[in-house]
């Protein structure tokens, strides 16, 4: 009997998680189309097909949904790259994948409101919580870059010289390109030129 109850509880929890995921995926579609400022609970309700009361069991506001989307997005971002790091794939392969992912993201951002939504959130929510979230995301970006560099060091491809500073520089360039993408004035050539400059910063072994 206890096992049956446990099984039923697990099934209920799975259904609850599935519904929460559906809300977040639907919200992502809304934010990508409308950004954050113009998105409403009504938009999200219509997109996911869950009643207003059903959504409020999980989230109390658009901002709360957006933060959950942002957290999920942050966790999933560059999952492939992190897996390659864990598997010690050749350094250049990982670096190429990292740049390729950013290139696609930046070019897609021209027509995708999600990046705009992220910056709208940071510019309109001047709170300690939003500041902490932004710092956490920047730190995570820098950490991922530094972990890629460490693979290069371990494989004898690059020297362990000023890598923390270079990782920070990468982070600034990537964030700057993201802001430029919001204006719609970013080009493939601009992205490629900046990636080439970032590569030149690396202390390759001769």
Q: Each PLM stretch: what is its role?
A:
Residues 1-18:
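N-terminal intrinsically disordered/low-complexity leader segments
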Residues 1-6, 97-105, 143-155, 171-206:
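C-terminal peripheral helix-coil segments that are non-catalytic and often amphipathic
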Residues 16-19, 141, 163-170, 191:
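Short amphipathic alpha-helix in the helical subdomain of ABC transporter nucleotide-binding domains
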Residues 19, 62, 73-77, 98, ...:
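Hydrophobic/aromatic residues within well-ordered alpha-helical segments
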Residues 22, 26, 30-64, 68:
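Helix-turn-helix
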Residues 68, 72, 82-110, 166-170, ...:
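Hydrophobic alpha-helical connector segments
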Residues 75, 83, 127-154, 165-168:
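Amphipathic alpha-helical packing segments from all-alpha helical-bundle domains
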Residues 106-129, 182:
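Amphipathic alpha-helical segments used for helix-helix packing
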């Amino acid at each position: 009997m206890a096992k049956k109850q446990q099984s039923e509880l697990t099934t209920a929890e799975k259904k609850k998680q599935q519904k929460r995921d559906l809300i977040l995926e639907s919200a992502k579609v809304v934010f990508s189309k409308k950004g954050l400022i113009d998105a409403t609970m009504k938009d999200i309700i219509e997109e996911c097909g869950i009643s207003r009361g059903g959504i409020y069991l999980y989230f109390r506001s658009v901002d709360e949904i957006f933060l959950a989307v942002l957290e999920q997005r942050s966790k999933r971002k560059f999952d492939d790259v992190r897996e390659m790091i864990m598997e010690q794939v050749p350094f250049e392969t990982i670096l190429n994948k990292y740049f390729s992912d950013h290139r696609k993201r930046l070019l897609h951002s021209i027509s995708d409101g999600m990046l705009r939504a992220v910056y709208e959130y940071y510019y309109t929510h001047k709170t300690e919580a939003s500041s902490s979230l932004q710092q956490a995301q920047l730190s995570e970006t820098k950490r991922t870059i530094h972990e890629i560099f460490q693979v290069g060091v371990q494989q004898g491809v690059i020297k362990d010289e000023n890598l923390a500073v270079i990782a920070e520089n990468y982070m600034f360039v990537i964030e700057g390109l993201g802001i430029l993408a919001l204006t719609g004035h970013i080009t493939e050539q601009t992205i490629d030129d900046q990636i080439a400059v970032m590569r030149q910063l690396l202390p390759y072994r001769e």
